[in-house]
């Protein structure tokens, strides 16, 4: 897959009910005749140089989307690995700074590329937090995606709280939790943490009305999932 083979889809993030649109999440997808999917194997096969070049392309494509859709608000996933790159941070500031009020950067919980010593891992975490602080001071909105999984453990999330405005939890991780009661306690713990820090808490992966109503009873306001809208090929003004 080269850069001509992938496209952006978008999925709504809503507040309280399906009618209140907060923003759309941009999703990188590879299209085939029958479906569109995230190209995981291709992503994992990239060299460091290819990885960086692909992110340059993503940054420029997102800028084009923002310029063509002047009133829409979006979010885009960027991995921790991309945000430790000083060159990519410079490109983000150059291309996205003027759109920062309409764009949320969702930081995914992707593990570091390659094997790292404890000291190297500490240096990576420090560089990541420094770059997050830099973007935060410039007025960018940062969100932590898939909290409670992978490298987005409670300890790591706590270390990044000063620089983020949102926490996102996915119900797709429910199979890792034993019972519905455990899940409720888990969600409410994250929700309490977000509220105590003045952060937005979003639950994604919602597929049914029952799930929507259950989360509403728990006091969870911001939601995302197939129930509110399946990812759709992004249509830009002027297309």
Regions found by a protein language model. Give the residues of each.
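EAL-family c-di-GMP phosphodiesterase catalytic domain
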Residues: 1-34, 108-115, 147-154, 158-239
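EAL-type cyclic di-GMP phosphodiesterase domain
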Residues: 32-56, 81-86, 99-137, 171-192, ...
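Helix C-cap/helix->beta junction micro-motif
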Residues: 70, 99, 138, 163, ...
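Active-site glycine- and acidic-residue-rich loops that bind
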Residues: 80-87, 140-141, 145-151
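Bacterial c-di-GMP phosphodiesterase EAL domain
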Residues: 1-98
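A general structural detector for well-ordered alpha-helical segments in enzyme core domains, enriched
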Residues: 61, 88-95, 124-132, 153-160, ...
């Amino acid at each position: 897959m080269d850069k001509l083979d992938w496209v952006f889809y978008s999925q709504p993030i809503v507040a309280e009910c399906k009618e209140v649109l907060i923003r759309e999440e941009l999703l990188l997808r590879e299209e085939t005749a029958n479906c569109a999917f995230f190209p995981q194997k291709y992503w994992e096969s990239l060299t460091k140089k290819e990885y960086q070049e692909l992110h340059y392309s993503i940054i420029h494509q997102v800028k084009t989307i923002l310029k063509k859709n002047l009133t829409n608000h979006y979010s885009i996933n960027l991995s921790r690995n991309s945000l430790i790159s000083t060159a990519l941070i410079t490109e983000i500031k150059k291309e996205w700074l003027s759109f920062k009020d309409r764009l949320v950067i969702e930081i995914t919980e992707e593990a570091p590329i390659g094997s790292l010593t404890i000291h190297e891992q500490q240096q990576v975490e420090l560089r990541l937090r420094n770059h997050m602080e830099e973007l935060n001071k410039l007025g960018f909105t940062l969100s932590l995606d898939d909290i409670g999984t992978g490298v987005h453990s409670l300890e790591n999330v706590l270390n990044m709280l000063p620089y983020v405005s949102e926490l996102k939890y996915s119900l797709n991780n429910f199979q890792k939790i034993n019972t519905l009661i455990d899940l409720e306690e888990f969600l409410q713990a994250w929700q309490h943490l977000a509220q105590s820090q003045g952060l937005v808490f979003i639950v994604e992966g919602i597929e049914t009305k029952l799930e929507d109503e259950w989360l509403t009873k728990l006091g969870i306001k911001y939601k995302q999932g197939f129930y509110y809208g399946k990812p759709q090929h992004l249509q830009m003004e002027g297309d």
